[in-house]
Amino acid sequence: MKIHNSDTAVVFIDPQNEVLSETGKPWPLLHESLKENNTIENMERIFKAAKSHDFEVFISPHYFFPVDKGWKFNGPLETEEFNNSLFARKGVLDLDGLIGSGADWLERFKPYIEDGKTVVVSPHRVWGPETNDLVLQLRKRGISKVILGGMLANMCVESHLRELVEQGFQVAVVKDATAAPKHPEWGYGYTAALINYAYIAHAVLTTDQAVEAMTSTLS
């Protein structure tokens, strides 16, 4: 997969406090994987490389609204999210209480996300981009290749990978710009994710490899 800023974009999933900050409710399950992968630092390196070399950046966020409590059924992790009010917002147009909450961006990422150039798409409602406008936004900008990272490795990142491939995009996953829960009953999600990345993605890169490819691209 050839990476070039004319047709390749960075897509980060859920760069939010809930899954990246010590204040996030799942921190006890995530902190080991985040530290082992150096996830936050690696995501920031990719942000910096993208901004310095004119790659478009897209954010696919995760939010839950009070009306979503009317859902009649949920999967295991969805149930945990609802029970613990993860990614909670007060309303679609209500920003009250957002700043500093689990749904807010990780503070160190805000300069990159809020620079007026990053495209924040509508929220994905479960795991994948089937329920938001990511694919539309990518196509409208002539993007056919994606550098993918963010959270969680085995859930939203993998779901975005699968759907983007189905939609005809080439996708490179940056394996150390993501992390996953170490769950006492369900297992280590990162191990499952790596196996599936190897089967599905057009490339599985380290952050070093991704940054090298981005910084050596010809404008």
Residues covered by each model-derived region:
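Active-site-adjacent betaalpha module
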Residues: 1-9, 18-19, 48, 52-53, ...
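A short alpha/beta connector and helix-capping loop motif
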Residues: 6-8, 23-50, 54-61
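N-terminal nucleotide-binding beta1-loop-alpha1 segment
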Residues: 13-15
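Short, well-ordered beta-to-alpha junction loops that form the rim of enzyme active sites
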Residues: 60-63, 151
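Short catalytic/ligand-binding loop motif for oxyanion handling, primarily in non-cytosolic enzymes
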Residues: 65-69
